[in-house]
C-alpha cells in the first residue's frame, strides 16, 4: 500500500452509511469504525483540527482505508461490532469489552 492520498480517497467516497477499516502499511487493521455518511466521517480524520493522542498516533500509521457500504445505519452498526470482535483492531478500545448495544 503505497501512495495513499487521504484527500483523494475521501473525495471518492459516497455519502452512504457504512463501515471503514484503517490499515497499516503491512495491511494490519488498525481501527474499524461506522459512519452515517462515509465521506464526512472518514474526511473528519484528515481535516485540520486537534485530535486526541490516540487518534493522532493512529493516523500516523494509516497507509490505506477499506470501506463497506451498507443499506442502513443499523446494518453498519452490526457489521462494525462483528468486525471489531473478530479482528480486534489495536485502536478499538471502546468496543472490545463485548458490551451489547
Describe each region flagged by the PLM.
Residues 1-101:
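Acidic, glycine-enriched active-site microenvironments
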Amino acid at each position: 500500500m503505497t501512495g495513499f492520498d487521504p484527500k483523494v480517497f475521501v473525495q471518492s467516497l459516497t455519502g452512504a452509511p457504512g463501515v471503514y477499516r484503517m490499515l497499516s502499511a503491512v495491511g494490519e487493521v488498525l481501527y474499524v469504525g461506522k459512519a452515517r455518511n462515509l465521506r464526512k466521517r472518514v474526511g473528519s480524520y484528515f481535516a485540520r483540527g486537534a485530535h486526541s493522542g490516540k487518534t493522532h498516533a493512529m493516523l500516523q500509521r494509516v497507509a490505506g482505508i477499506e470501506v463497506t457500504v451498507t443499506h442502513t445505519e443499523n446494518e453498519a452498526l452490526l457489521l462494525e461490532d462483528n468486525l471489531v470482535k473478530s479482528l480486534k483492531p489495536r485502536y478499538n478500545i471502546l468496543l472490545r469489552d463485548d458490551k451489547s448495544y
